[in-house]
Amino acid sequence: MKALITGAGGQVGRALQSTAPPGVSLLALGSGQLDITSADAVTALVEAERPDLIFNTAAYTAVDKAESEEDRARLVNGDAVGFLSSAARQTGARLIHISTDFAFDGTASTPYPPDAPPAPLGAYGRSKVVGEVEAQNGALIARTAWAYGSHGHNFVRTMLRLMAQRDEVRVVTDQIGTPTWATSLAQALWRMADASARGIWHYTDSGVASWYDFAVAIQEEALALGLLDRAVPVIPITTADFPTPARRPAYSVLDKSATFALLGGAAPHWRVNLRKMLKDIQTHG
């Protein structure tokens, strides 16, 4: 089996490579190797390589910047998915596309099921919903949330840096979701692909947290592992205290019950996977 991975240098792209099952031939490409916004480039590569699976982890993820660059966000997160989907259909490949909790407006009080109507709050979310529509026709669309990994820019890395540099950190406490380790997501994606899952599915780690809860846990676990040498106050603030160009959903917990049933069990709790990720940093840097 051959699998094409776009966005190979990102958190999920790296995790897919490190968790690939035995016997899978990987073609992992970054933006410098494949411009997914070029329909001709996508078609030519897919026709030449003939992958069985196409994992699209490439994305425009600058949530705030997207408010002033919506055309660019839509091109990468929306139109380009259509190019990949078309190439997949033409060659018989299966597309596995990564989407987001930002598809929802956050007004719910219970986890969002996969068939909940999308209602994005901003440009980034709108662009990702366009991508979901473009990816239809047999694709697996996996919505996830609050992803982080050992590499790249993410909340865990940012908190570790700030906690080492500052006398206190301030973190919003009124946005609720579920932190998700990229390795956990990647392992699930391989299994879902093996099960020939299609349509929209939800996957995050188990449990619920605010960004404040997540930050507190990061400090506690990092101190226990010696990644931080001192504790600093973590101050809870509200979203109103920390205005940003893009609005964020206040509640974006996803209902994973169907996915967990497909996989034969629930994902580990987010704090368990946080500890695993920090141990990976401790070992490999």
Residue locations for each model-derived region?
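N-terminal Rossmann NAD(P)H-binding glycine-rich loop of SDR-like oxidoreductase domains
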Residues: A3-A20
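Amphipathic terminal alpha-helices
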Residues: H269-G285
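Catalytic helix-loop patch of NAD(P)-dependent Rossmann-fold dehydrogenases
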Residues: S68, L75, A80-F83, A103-A142, ...
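Substrate-binding strand-loop-helix patch
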Residues: S150-H151, Q175-S184, T204-E221, K276
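NAD(P)-dependent short-chain dehydrogenase/reductase
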Residues: V133, N137-S184, W190
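Adenosine-cofactor binding site in Rossmann-like domains, unifying the SAM/SAH pocket
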Residues: P22-A44
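Mid/C-terminal beta-alpha module of Rossmann-like enzyme folds, strongest
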Residues: A188, A195-P245, G285
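NAD(P)H-binding glycine-rich loop region in Rossmannoid oxidoreductase-like domains
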Residues: I36-G78, A87
